[in-house]
Design a protein with these regions (language model features):
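N-terminal signal peptide c-region/cleavage motif recognized by signal peptidases
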Residues: 20-22
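Catalytic histidine-centered segment of alpha/beta-hydrolase-like enzymes
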Residues: 281-290, 294
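Active-site machinery of serine-nucleophile hydrolases
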Residues: 76-85
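Active-site glycine-rich loops that stabilize anionic/oxyanionic intermediates
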Residues: 60-63, 128
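Flexible "cap/lid" subdomain of the alpha/beta-hydrolase fold that forms the substrate-access gate
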Residues: 27-29, 38-41, 46-49, 54, ...
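Bacterial N-terminal signal peptides that target proteins for export
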Residues: 1-11
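Structural cue for short, hydrophobic secondary-structure segments
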Residues: 57-60, 83
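Serine-hydrolase catalytic-loop signature spanning alpha/beta hydrolases and amidase-signature enzymes
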Residues: 62-70, 81
C-alpha cells in the first residue's frame, strides 16, 4: 500500500508481464441511454452481472466509446464496465450552445449513467477531456467515487501551471486556440478527425461515429473549458483534493499535453497515487500501449 506521500512509477513494469491477461480480443456490449435534464447520453455496457463498483469510462477528443474496446475486453471479465459517448459525440444528444458543454454538466451526465446502474459508487476512468470530467467528478462527488483512473490528462492545476510557465506547452496548445475561434468546426472532417486511427477496421467505425457527431458541439469543449491567453498561474491551491486512490497513466510522447504537468500531482490528492509513465506511447495511450494500459488497470483495480 502506498501512502499519500509516495508514488509507484512503472515505466514498463516487469511485475505486470506475468499477469494472464490479454487485451487483444473484444467482448460483446449492449447499448443503452441515460438522461440528464433532457439530454440523452449513449453508453455501452459489458459484464453487468459482475459484483462491485462499476467502471465508467469516458473518452476524449476526437474519440468515442470504442476507444476503450481493448480495456473493456479484459476488465469486463471481473467488473461491470460502462463506456459513454460524451454529449455531442456519436449516439449521444448534441444540444446547441457553448454553455451546454461546461464540465459540470458533463459530470452530471456521468452521474446519470451511474444512477442507472443502481450502484452507489463507481470507478471513474477518463482520457483527455474525459480525464477532465473524471478529475472533476472525483472532486465534486467523492461520495460516488471509489477510485479514479486518468489517462493523458494531468490534474487541472498542473495543466494550468504549465500553460502559464512553460513556453513549449503554450506552443503545443496552439491547436486549442484554433479550436476556440468562431467557425473552427467548419474546417473539420470525419476523415481528418480519424487520421490518428491506424487500425483499418477500427478506422471505419470511427468514420461512422464521427459522421454521426456534431463538430461544432465537439469544439464547444474547448470554447467553454480550455484556458485562454493570457495564461495565468492558478490563483490559489486546489481547495478540494481528490479523496480516493488515483491511477495516473501518461504516454510520454504526447505532444498536446506535456509530462511536466504531472509534477506535484501528489499535492492535490489525499489518498494513494500510482503513476504509470509509458515511453513510446502518445496521447492515445490506451490504444498505443493497449496491453500495458489494460494490465496496469486490471492489476491496480485488483488490489
Amino acid at each position: 500500500m502506498f501512502n499519500r506521500q509516495t508514488i509507484s512509477s512503472w515505466l514498463i513494469a516487469a511485475t505486470l508481464a506475468f499477469l494472464p491477461l490479454s487485451s487483444q480480443g473484444q467482448t460483446e456490449v449492449s447499448h443503452h441511454f441515460a438522461k440528464n435534464n433532457g439530454v440523452k447520453i449513449h453508453y455501452v455496457s459489458a459484464g453487468d452481472k459482475n459484483p462491485g463498483a462499476p467502471v465508467i469510462m469516458i473518452h476524449g477528443f476526437p474519440d468515442y466509446w470504442y476507444t476503450w474496446r481493448k480495456q473493456i475486453a479484459v476488465l469486463a471479465k471481473t467488473r461491470h464496465v460502462l463506456a459513454i459517448d460524451l454529449r455531442g459525440f456519436n449516439k449521444s444528444d448534441k444540444p446547441k450552445g457553448v454553455d451546454n458543454y461546461a464540465i459540470p454538466l458533463l459530470v452530471e451526465d456521468v452521474t446519470a449513467v451511474l444512477k442507472q446502474t443502481g450502484k452507489k459508487k463507481a470507478v471513474i476512468c477518463g482520457h483527455d477531456w474525459g480525464g477532465m470530467v473524471a478529475w472533476t467528478f472525483a472532486m465534486t462527488h467523492p461520495e460516488l467515487t471509489e477510485k479514479l483512473i486518468v489517462l493523458n490528462l494531468p490534474h487541472p492545476q498542473g495543466l494550468t501551471r504549465e500553460l502559464a510557465t512553460n513556453p513549449q506547452q503554450q506552443k503545443n496548445s496552439a491547436y486549442a486556440r484554433e479550436f476556440q475561434k468562431p467557425g473552427a468546426h467548419k474546417k473539420l472532417t470525419a476523415e481528418g478527425l480519424a487520421s490518428w486511427v491506424t487500425d483499418a477496421a477500427a478506422k471505419e467505425k470511427y468514420l461512422e461515429a464521427f459522421r454521426r457527431s456534431d463538430f461544432e458541439a465537439m469544439l464547444n469543449l474547448y470554447k467553454k473549458n480550455y484556458p485562454r491567453p493570457p495564461y495565468e498561474l492558478p490563483k490559489e491551491a486546489a481547495k478540494v483534493k481528490v479523496a480516493c486512490p488515483v491511477l495516473l497513466i501518461h504516454g510520454l510522447d504526447d505532444k498536446a499535453l506535456l509530462a511536466g504537468a504531472l509534477n506535484d500531482t501528489w499535492n492535490w490528492i489525499e489518498s494513494d497515487l500510482t503513476l504509470v509513465t509509458i515511453p513510446g506511447a502518445g496521447h492515445f495511450v490506451q490504444q498505443d500501449a493497449a496491453d500495458l494500459v489494460t494490465r496496469s488497470m486490471a492489476s491496480w483495480l485488483a488490489r
